[in-house]
A protein has these predicted regions:
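Catalytic core of pol beta-like nucleotidyltransferases
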Residues: 2, 14-88, 94-101, 109-184
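Cationic, low-complexity basic patches in intrinsically disordered or flexible, solvent-exposed regions
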Residues: 6-9, 24
Length: 184
């Protein structure tokens, strides 16, 4: 469990690390954001692996972003505990937008025990208002259609302002995510 102070201290210490030096220590590095012509820089095209700790370090940079991260972490844990093996994070939270309003998440339903899911994660009524209230973001099964002939996993990989390809994060599901507490 990391306190806000320890996260800030770690950020200061790791500013001088390069992508190459962190890879020597087997750390995954979220790539630098790129400009695709939209209002904010986004992740480069592709699906980029990241742990909860890495996501928090990179994108939990202010109070608003920290609250969104904690909401995502709560939803992520419900999905993981229900058996989802693939959970993806997208939205303005993973851009350079200073104060994003929410995040978008899609998840693979394969192997999920629906009985273990919070029913709110399957409530898409009223523009997903219940999800936003409880988790500060939106959760979509990746196999659902976001648009005609386009599933959420593919839909999230396009910039909504320009239509250009962009990246998303696949959250690593392993023991390392137990270090981040959703109760902070």
């Amino acid at each position: 469990m990391f306190s806000r102070k320890s996260v800030q201290r770690l950020r200061r210490r790791t500013r001088s690390l390069t992508k190459e030096s962190t890879q020597l220590f087997c750390c995954v590095v979220i790539p630098d954001l790129i400009d695709v012509g939209g209002p904010w820089k986004v992740l480069p095209p592709g699906i980029h692996e990241a742990s909860l700790d890495e996501i928090r370090m990179r994108f939990g940079t202010n109070r608003q972003r920290e609250e969104l991260f904690m909401g995502f972490t709560r939803g992520y844990r419900v999905l993981r505990d229900a058996g989802s093996q693939q959970i993806y994070l997208d939205g303005s939270f993973v851009t350079e937008k200073p104060n994003p309003e929410d995040y978008d998440c899609c998840w693979d339903m394969a192997g999920v025990d629906v009985e273990k899911l919070d029913p709110v994660l399957l409530d898409f009524s009223d523009k997903r208002a219940a999800q936003k209230r409880k988790y500060q973001g939106e959760f979509f099964p990746s196999s659902f259609q976001a648009a005609p002939c386009e599933f959420f996993l593919d839909y999230f990989r396009k910039d909504k302002y320009t239509g250009q390809a962009k990246g998303i994060l696949r959250v690593q599901s392993a023991a390392q995510d137990s270090e981040v507490s959703a109760d902070q």
